[in-house]
Amino acid sequence: MKILKPYMRNTSILYYLCFLLNSHFLTEAGIHVFILGCVSVGLPKTEANWIDVRYDLEKIESLIQFIHIDTTLYTDSDFHPSCKVTAMNCFLLELQVILHEYSNMTLNETVRNVLYLANSTLSSNKNVIESGCKECEELEERNFTEFLQSFIHIVQMFINTS
């Protein structure tokens, strides 16, 4: 199972550092190192999670062979590279439909992980304004298999540019 918060992987190292510096708290330098160490625990890492997103999407692809998903989702199959953030936001909104319509625990857990990883990685691009892009509702509705193929394609574009 994937870690839902991959940027928290190395926090235990900082805790050990804090305990190590415990004997040096009486010095001003020790206090500064301790405070900076504690502050850095809350800062997210900037590493891209797109490879993990692609892995989870491929896992969903294998899961749907055993689960009958009869839904159509707005799918941007021919998006322009200058609209990739807008297209990704549409894919993420549509993926939430699966959470609401299907109750398979493994599927929902994987979908939640995709949403979390993609949103946390995309958060730095949330305020990007891309002009001339289609709204989500203007996109063509496709079945879930085609939706996943297009989703994997756009994630691959993010991997190639990071």
From Swiss-Prot:
GO cellular component term of the entry, any: cell surface
GO molecular function annotations of the record: cytokine activity; cytokine receptor binding
Residues in the signal sequence: 1-29
GO biological process: angiogenesis; cell maturation; cellular response to vitamin D; extrathymic T cell selection; hyaluronan metabolic process; immune response; interleukin-15-mediated signaling pathway; lymph node development
Keywords: Cytokine, Disulfide bond, Glycoprotein, Secreted, Signal
Sites where a glycan is attached: N10, N104, N108, N119, N143
Compartment(s) of residence: Secreted
Annotated S-S bridges: C83-C133, C90-C136
InterPro entries, per the entry: 4_helix_cytokine-like_core, IL-15, IL-15/IL-21_fam, IL-15_mml
Entries under Pfam families matching the protein: IL15 (PF02372)
Keyword Mitochondrion appears in the UniProt entry: no
Propeptide position ranges: 30-48
UniProt key word Protein transport: no
Primary role: Cytokine that stimulates the proliferation of T-lymphocytes. Stimulation by IL15 requires interaction of IL15 with components of the IL2 receptor, including IL2RB and probably IL2RG but not IL2RA. In neutrophils, stimulates phagocytosis probably by signaling through the IL15 receptor, composed of the subunits IL15RA, IL2RB and IL2RG, which results in kinase SYK activation.
Family under the similarity heading: Belongs to the IL-15/IL-21 family.
Annotated protein name in UniProt: Interleukin-15
Organism listed in the record: Rattus norvegicus (Rat)
Lineage, opening ranks: Eukaryota, Metazoa, Chordata, Craniata, Vertebrata
